[in-house]
Amino acid sequence: VPVDFLLDTGAERTVLTPAAAQRIGAQPPRIEFDRRMHGIAGSLPIREVELRRFTIGGVAIPWRRIAVAPATLPSVFFGPLDGLLGADVLSFFDVDIDLPRHRMILHEQPSCPLAAPDWAEPFVAIDTGRSAGEHLFFPVHLDGRAIVAIIDTGAKITTLSTKIAMALGVSDAMLARDRSITLRGAAGESVTARVHRFSQLEVGRDATHDPEIAVATLNLRDADLVLGFDFVSSRRMWLSYGSRRIFLSRAKRQRSD
């Protein structure tokens, strides 16, 4: 039975909606545990199902225990999404994500660390750590200060924790003058954020000048900054979970104002 997932590198678990789980006839495992799904600022309880078969583009997925939760998903033109494809599945592979061309390729993890992908476009290589939640985390520099970031294709906008923003010299008065937006997490939570313009964000050797970044109180366990879809949408990236490296192409367009 085909299902449509949102590619979400920031989600720790792959999640089906209750409606999708019922449609495909997914069954609960013999032994169940109390689990929770964590969002940007909250969590909600989940249950689990065992899939008889799970493939993506013809590639068999070895991990077939999937979470079921009423996750908050964005609207797409062809109808409702059936869930999130998260890091618990992605981490079995080296993942080549070409967002400008709307394409993803799953590669078997190499027996030795990948030297570099065979891309025509220029890119940067980033050494990372790998958290308990299967996030590849790595240092970036925001206004000259080293902080820790993850890539989250499920996040609409790049977001920084309020605590780190304050450490960078952003005051409450400055944030009060910034534009207010509402962030919605997959766990159903809503968070008020302020969009603040910083001087420079440096990822690898690739610098973005005058980036606009949302500042919000976040429930992040392994990062200070979430690099969202606004940052990665014009880039190609290779996530090598086995060798703990990320290869990131340079943006097709950079803000100059």
Locations of the language-model features?
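Pepsin/retropepsin-fold aspartyl endopeptidases
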Residues: 1-257
